[in-house]
């Protein structure tokens, strides 16, 4: 199974969705919903830098995919009144790739590097003096004739985004003056996002319909917008085009997205632990064989949300289903779950 095959995958699904995301993206901080802490901090730092006519300090945005890191980078550039250049860590293979971007920046411009944890060590070394002293040290020539040339750069702001902050090297992380973690959104925040997107897409939606979509969106705006588009199609064909709670519920049931935002693969994994392995503990290899998936798919794609929501636990002895998992599927809870015996292994 490929993650992007799932309707509730937090990653972008193709260029068409990227284009639609761009159209739905808020342009300024006042339009940005949620992330109150990060938004409040950025508003102060942006206003201060703008008042001094300086470049904003370098910004690191980290958190799960689909929460608005790229959107915030665009907003930072817009609020600062400067241009933004966008790239990603895997694309910057050589020092020259980064040098070409840096030397074409105007004063106070924003350089956005997505997946910054995937920068090569060679490129990262070039980035250090650029971030710290606004200078670029590059080697010209090879062998004994090689020489270092220093280029002065205009002041700029590097905005780095990553889903894996732990993979950043300490020297790189320490060079960011502003570090913001993006959290999963509440259902109310997502309902506001769904309402805003529905307005831009010219979709008639009721408050309860927006909430129904929000509750199943796994705390992620990207998923909420994707589900909205699918529910819109259902409402257009099966009803009068208005997205009510009943229409949203019927559409999402048809799409196999349940009340918790679980899809077929989530339920398959949980039921395997519950029914085939008596709730666990079960080793990862056995679980992978039982549901016909790769170990990496379970660890990187399926498990994180189930663990974060409290339906699955990782222990030294293996995976264990929690009381919530039994309750979700209407199964009797074994006595051992409530005794704490499993947690003490």
Curated annotation (Swiss-Prot):
It comes from the Bacteria. One of its GO terms (biological process) is DNA recombination. GO terms for cellular component: cytoplasm; Holliday junction resolvase complex. It holds the Pfam family RuvB_N. It catalyses: ATP + H2O = ADP + phosphate + H(+). Residues 4-185 are annotated as: Large ATPase domain (RuvB-L). InterPro entries: AAA+_ATPase, AAA_lid_4, DNA_helicase_Holl-junc_RuvB, P-loop_NTPase, RuvB-like_N, RuvB_C, WH-like_DNA-bd_sf, WH_DNA-bd_sf. Homohexamer. Forms an RuvA(8)-RuvB(12)-Holliday junction (HJ) complex. HJ DNA is sandwiched between 2 RuvA tetramers; dsDNA enters through RuvA and exits via RuvB. An RuvB hexamer assembles on each DNA strand where it exits the tetramer. Each RuvB hexamer is contacted by two RuvA subunits (via domain III) on 2 adjacent RuvB subunits; this complex drives branch migration. In the full resolvosome a probable DNA-RuvA(4)-RuvB(12)-RuvC(2) complex forms which resolves the HJ. HAMAP family: DNA_HJ_migration_RuvB. This is Holliday junction branch migration complex subunit RuvB. It comes from Methylobacillus flagellatus (strain ATCC 51484 / DSM 6875 / VKM B-1610 / KT). The gene is ruvB.
């Amino acid at each position: 199974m490929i993650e992007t095959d799932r309707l509730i995958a937090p990653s972008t699904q193709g260029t068409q969705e990227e284009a639609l995301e761009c159209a739905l993206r808020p342009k300024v901080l006042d339009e940005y919903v949620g992330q109150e802490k990060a938004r409040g901090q950025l508003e102060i730092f942006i206003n201060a830098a703008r008042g001094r006519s300086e470049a904003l300090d370098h910004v690191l945005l980290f958190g799960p995919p689909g929460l608005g890191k790229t959107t915030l980078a665009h907003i930072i550039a817009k609020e600062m009144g400067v241009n933004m250049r966008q790239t990603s860590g895997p694309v910057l293979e050589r020092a020259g790739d980064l040098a070409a971007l840096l030397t074409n920046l105007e004063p106070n411009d924003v350089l956005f590097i997505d997946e910054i944890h995937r920068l090569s060590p060679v490129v990262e070394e070039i980035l250090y003096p650029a971030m710290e002293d606004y200078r670029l040290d590059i080697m010209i020539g090879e062998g004994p004739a090689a020489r270092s040339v220093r280029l002065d750069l205009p002041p700029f702001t590097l905005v780095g985004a990553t889903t894996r902050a732990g993979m950043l090297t300490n020297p790189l992380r320490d060079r960011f003056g502003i570090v913001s973690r993006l959290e999963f959104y509440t259902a109310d925040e997502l309902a506001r996002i769904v309402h805003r997107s529905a307005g831009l897409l010219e979709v008639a939606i009721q408050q309860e319909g927006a909430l129904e979509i929000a509750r199943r969106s796994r705390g992620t705006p990207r998923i909420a917008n994707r589900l909205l588009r699918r529910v819109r199609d259902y409402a257009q064909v099966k009803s009068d085009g208005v997205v009510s709670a009943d229409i949203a519920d019927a559409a999402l049931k048809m799409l196999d997205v349940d009340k918790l935002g679980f899809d077929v693969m989530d339920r398959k994994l949980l039921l395997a632990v519950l029914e085939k392995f008596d709730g666990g503990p079960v080793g990862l290899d056995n679980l992978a064989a039982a549901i016909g998936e790769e170990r990496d798919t379970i660890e990187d794609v399926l498990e994180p949300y189930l663990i974060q929501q409290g339906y699955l636990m990782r222990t030294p002895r293996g995976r264990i289903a929690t009381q919530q998992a039994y309750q979700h599927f209407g199964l009797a809870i074994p006595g051992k779950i409530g005794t704490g015996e499993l947690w003490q292994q």
